[in-house]
Each structure stands twice: as C-alpha cells, then as structure tokens.
Amino acid sequence: MIDHTGIATDHPTAARAFYDAVFAALGGGMLMEVPKEYTGGKMVIGYGRDQPVFWVSEQPAGPGRHTAFAASRAQVDAFYAAAMDAGGSDNGPPGLRPEYHADYYAAFVHDPDGNNIEAVCHAPA
C-alpha cells in the first residue's frame, strides 16, 4: 500500500495553482508547506484530505509521471473542469474506459510539467 508519492516541478507557481484547483475538486487541498529554510529555498508542498499524500517539489522535473486519484464520478468531472481551468491540457475527457473494465470512469490531464494526472472511479453508475 502506498502512503504518499510526489512529483518534481520546474514551474512552481503554475504547479501550485494547478494542484490547488485539482485537489479542491477532489475534496482535499494543500495541507503542508515545508519551511524554505529546510528545502534550500525551494517550494515543497503536500496535498491530501486528512494528511499529505501527494507532494509537489520544486526541482528539475524528469520524465512525465502518471498518478491517479480515487474519486466519485462527480469528482472525476469536477477534477477535469478544474484542471483545464487551471492550465492543464486534455489527455482524455471524463468517460468510461471499458478497455480497463466496464465501470472504469476516468479523466486524464497533463499538468504544467507534462505529468499525466488522472481521477478515476471504479464504482458502477
């Protein structure tokens, strides 16, 4: 079981605005910002609902990563709209993905650093 994960960003201001919007749509938010005296002056912020589970760190971004967040169908739709409004780019609008399984309802966007970010619901309609 994964406790937390993270990504790097070359665009800290854009990444913060993007993930603030995305996590608000998923019922969460930015829960922690590591003081810059501990990070060499770089942004390190943690997002989640009850505890930080997704970290965004200002450092050279590597190859794009894929991260999927568990959501309801309504949250998948809200995630996609919020991500697009916050500067994300489309990588698959909300809808069923039967190639994965009959109830796989998801949306995919690229964040400002090109990471493939997904919200997914596995529950039947």
How would you name each of these model-derived features?
Residues 8-52:
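Core segments of cupin and vicinal oxygen chelate
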Residues 9-14, 68-112:
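Vicinal oxygen chelate
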Residues 108-122:
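A cross-kingdom feature marking charged/low-complexity
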Residues 1-3:
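Extreme N-terminal starter segment of soluble prokaryotic enzymes
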